[in-house]
């Protein structure tokens, strides 16, 4: 018995691939099964006839099996005779497939008898009961094999199904041995003509019973499903023994045939879906639709939120502040603000629709995310903060208006001062050749060595009767040194004499001579005025210099009036009084001169009209002189003119700055005067 067990155990190990691959065998498998049946029939042909005659009344399903045997015998008779001459070892090996089905039939019976799934054919040395059971099992085995083969011919992709899932077997053999069982559930075809006795090849030697040692032997585990090529080669690899399998797991595994069928179906389905999924780049159509729609909804929500924030910020900014605020740009492409799609979606991204579907709930204004790729110059203000901050600004309306008016006023004043500064600092108009020669004649009066030094300046001051200290003389020379080289040359002298600011300071100082000390800053203008009054310069030089300064005074007066108008408008709008010191600081020299003149005209005009001091002062720059009279009396009245031209005091009536030129000695008033001074001829007669 031990011998028999040792021989059958390797075959049991090699039987598992046959059981797993028997469900999907092709025509090759069908031929192999027929060869195994023929070989088995040759070994027990003599005993088959006797057993059939004895078992026919005893077998419960005997008449039901005869048509199958007859059909199988007819099929076997059509096989070529060369198949019987094949090696017996292969026939024994291929015979294991049909016999394993017989094992499932025997185990499903309630008698509890177990038949070995595999074993070598034994001679007819068994009892009658064993022969009956073997005969009935053999008949069922042949029928089930033929039905499976018939189905395989019609549909190779559908293996024979098992009844173990619908009818679980609760036998001791399943719990002890754990062997896979299978029961074929194919419908029985209609019986055909013929008897079981007519089949000479139906007899198969009986199989030995399973002993207690065989029950305790480890079961054969199912193998991994193989490809069609492996299934074709499985027949020849059955005879080779395999290493002992590991110990079985406690729960009984499902039948290997069912598991192989499920795995094959799953594998085929996955292989068919794999190209489509690889092309789409997703795990399934459901995930694709969910991911794509989610991305579209997120993009639409982000765009809608950004658009609402932009409109709201623009409206609030326009309402609360008059200043222009740079808004968030929304004219960029839509794809710039679209976040990237998930990595599982490799299809090209499409632009989001401009309108939001009706079934999409719009997000809250303050909770919508802002896209990170959107470039913006101004951060959008949250709407929730603006809603409750707006009423707080209402009581502060008056203060805001005052602050705004003050800011606007300061900006206008700054603009006016900037205009005046630019007018002062602009490049002086280029002097003509005649004008330059006229200033050259004035420069030569100092008789210096090509420059004005302290010695020559003191001599001129003594000639005209001015008294200056040496410190004041040095200060005057330093102020005249424009380039700072320590020498007052002709270039520096021209810069001083054409300086507009110095000129208007000199005019103001002449008006207020009685109350202002000598100014070294305007000393050269004072000397020029006296020299023109003394007619110490050539006639051409006097005319050019007078015309030049009259033009400068006219431009300055018009500019002062414009400044006065602008400042008056600002003062009326702001209605904020200035102190006297602020007024003095804000006024320009031209405006200050006009203000002083108007104030002096208003004070005691009638009383001071007959005063000798009401005479127009002897200020030079008057070209309308009688040339013959000047030449005739220049030598005799030189010293007296110098003494008379030294101003000691000035009367309040100084309106002679704008007198209309007429007869000699005329004192008529005119606001559109073309000449600065016109009363010098009255003194020369």
Swiss-Prot record:
Domain EF-hand: 468-503
Segments of this protein annotated with the region Disordered: 1-289, 302-385, 656-685
Biased composition (Low complexity): 18-27
Tissues showing expression: Expressed in testis. Exclusively expressed in haploid spermatids and very weakly in spermatogonia, spermatocytes, and Sertoli cells as well as in interstitial cell.
Polar residues biased stretches: 70-108, 323-338, 374-385
MF terms in GO: calcium ion binding
Function noted in UniProt: Involved in the differentiation of haploid spermatids.
Protein name, entry field: Spermatogenesis-associated protein 21
Species this chain originates from: Rattus norvegicus (Rat)
Lineage: Eukaryota, Metazoa, Chordata, Craniata, Vertebrata
């Amino acid at each position: 018995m031990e011998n028999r067990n040792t021989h059958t155990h390797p075959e049991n190990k090699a039987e598992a691939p046959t059981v797993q691959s028997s469900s999907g065998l092709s025509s090759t498998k069908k031929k192999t099964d027929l060869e195994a049946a023929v070989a088995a029939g040759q070994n027990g042909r003599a005993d088959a006839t006797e057993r059939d005659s004895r078992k026919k009344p005893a077998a419960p399903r005997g008449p039901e099996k005869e048509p199958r045997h007859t059909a199988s015998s007819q099929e076997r008779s059509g096989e070529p005779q060369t198949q019987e001459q094949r090696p017996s070892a292969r026939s024994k090996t291929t015979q294991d497939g049909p016999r394993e089905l017989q094992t499932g039939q025997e185990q499903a019976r309630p008698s509890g008898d177990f038949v070995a799934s595999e074993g070598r054919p034994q001679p007819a040395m068994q009892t009658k009961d064993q022969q009956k059971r073997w005969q009935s099992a053999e008949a069922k085995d042949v029928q089930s094999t033929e039905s499976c083969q018939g189905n395989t011919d019609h549909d190779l992709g559908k293996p024979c199904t098992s009844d173990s899932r619908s009818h679980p077997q609760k036998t001791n053999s399943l719990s002890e041995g754990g062997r896979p069982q299978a029961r074929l559930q194919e419908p029985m075809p209609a019986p055909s003509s013929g008897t079981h006795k007519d089949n000479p090849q139906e007899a198969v030697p009986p199989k030995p019973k399973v002993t207690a040692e065989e029950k305790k032997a480890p079961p054969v585990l199912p193998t991994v499903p193989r490809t069609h090529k492996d299934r074709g080669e499985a027949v020849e690899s059955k005879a080779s023994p395999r290493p002992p399998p590991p110990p079985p797991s406690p729960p009984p595994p499902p039948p290997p045939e069912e598991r192989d069928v499920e795995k094959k179906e799953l594998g085929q389905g996955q292989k068919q879906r794999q190209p489509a999924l690889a092309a789409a780049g997703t795990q399934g159509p459901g995930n694709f639709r969910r991911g794509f729609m989610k991305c579209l909804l997120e993009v639409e929500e982000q765009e809608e939120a950004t658009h609402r924030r932009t409109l709201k910020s623009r409206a609030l900014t326009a309402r609360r502040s008059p200043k222009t605020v740079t808004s968030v740009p929304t004219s960029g492409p839509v794809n710039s603000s679209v976040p990237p799609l998930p990595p599982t979606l490799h299809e090209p991204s499409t632009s989001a629709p401009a309108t939001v579907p009706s079934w999409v709930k719009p997000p809250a204004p303050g909770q919508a995310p802002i896209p990170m790729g959107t470039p913006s110059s101004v951060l959008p203000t949250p709407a929730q903060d603006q809603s409750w901050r707006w009423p707080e600004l209402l009581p502060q309306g008056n203060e805001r208006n005052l602050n705004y008016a003050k800011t606007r006023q300061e900006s206008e004043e700054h603009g006016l001062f900037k205009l005046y500064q630019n007018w002062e600092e602009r490049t002086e108009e280029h002097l003509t050749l005649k004008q330059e020669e006229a200033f050259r004649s004035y420069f030569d009066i100092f008789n210096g060595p090509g420059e004005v030094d302290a010695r020559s300046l003191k001599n001129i001051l003594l000639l005209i009767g001015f008294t200056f200290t040496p410190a004041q003389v040095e200060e005057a020379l330093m102020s005249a040194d424009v380039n700072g080289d320590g020498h007052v040359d002709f270039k520096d002298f021209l810069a001083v004499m054409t300086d507009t600011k110095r000129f208007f300071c000199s005019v103001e100082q002449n008006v207020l001579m009685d109350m202002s000390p000598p100014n070294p800053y305007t000393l050269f203008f004072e000397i020029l005025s006296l020299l023109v009054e003394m007619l110490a310069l050539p006639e051409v030089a006097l005319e050019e210099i007078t015309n030049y300064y009259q033009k400068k005074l006219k431009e300055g007066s018009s500019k002062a009036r414009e400044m006065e108008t602008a400042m008056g408008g600002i003062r009326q709008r702001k209605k904020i009084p200035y102190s006297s010191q602020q007024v003095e600081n804000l006024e320009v020299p031209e405006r200050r001169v006009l203000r002083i003149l108007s104030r002096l005209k208003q004070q005691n005009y009638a009383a001071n009209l007959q005063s000798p001091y009401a005479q127009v002062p002897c200020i030079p720059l008057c070209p309308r002189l009688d040339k013959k009279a000047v030449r005739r009396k220049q030598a005799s009245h030189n010293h007296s003119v110098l003494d008379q031209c030294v101003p000691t005091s000035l009367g309040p009536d100084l309106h002679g700055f704008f007198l209309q030129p007429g007869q000699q000695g005329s004192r008529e008033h005119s606001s559109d005067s073309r000449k600065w001074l016109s009363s010098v001829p009255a003194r020369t007669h």
